[in-house]
């Protein structure tokens, strides 16, 4: 069987798929993995044929910061989807026609994979390394007000971008056709149903395979003291003041501290390092977590999953809305506590609380047990094989809007933007914005009435 996989250039989205690649290859399948040069080494080490997407268009090279915006900044995401899809169109469509893959597997943020699969009518599997997302789970996941406002103000530009996709033969009715998976899309989610918010609202097309972790290469020895691990991940980790506060908080603590500060942090600039603390630009996180008793984390999905797999309770310090959602879930299930402030006193108090809370440790262990009960790479590979054996199926895209519907949407969106801006103003300006918003809202309904009359 031939499999084409697509991913964004992010370690947190790539790493969970590598075990699946190895499992598929062990079953005699061939995998072509479309990603970015920064991921070449680990993808080729897993045994896949690596195809560099950034070779097709120099403008496609994504920074780590841009990768982190995918899926969070909806306006940016839509523009990127169109740009990447059009850049890949000729070459990748030709590749797919030549390779004739039995199935396409696309990261949930590599939306172009789904568009290509639909265009060529090839069976498709969504690979979801974050929580699965639907209307119900979206209600409990935080969103950025600024991102939503940016999306609303960019709707006109977004719709023009989608027209470019339609001209190339991509069936796209609205941006929601790209950004949302439906209940009929075969999907692999790299967590357990127990950890997934609103898990009961997802259909049987969703396989919760659990985290797929690599073996620990070089195990660390257990210390006679509690081990505390501190890391803010691989993307947004340049926070020297936070690291200095951790050093101040724990310099005389009766514990072994291991702190990973990222490649871009100058360790010498952090000041004197106490004897009980080890500071490195990068560590073998799996090896450290395997012997840790507490983890101070930014709450990236992979980091949290790895910690819970080993039953390590968490001190939660989320930096983005997505990480806030993961932190909220950990807190709701009783496996971690929020860091109240990033001051030395608060950090020390939070770590002491986590180290001394048997209930947190028990909840973390329970979630780790739920991960181990999942099918892992074998379950993910089974889903991919099963999808490849079925005819391609895609839900019909939402119909393209009529001119009247477009006018209604534009006027209604403008009204909503004015009302949102009014929330941050006062006095006469606020009253004017509210009046204008109400008038435009009425105008939107008039367009709706007139459009219905024409149908």
Kindly give the residue locations of the regions a language model identified.
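C-terminal amphipathic helix plus adjacent low-complexity
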Residues: 344-424, 433-440
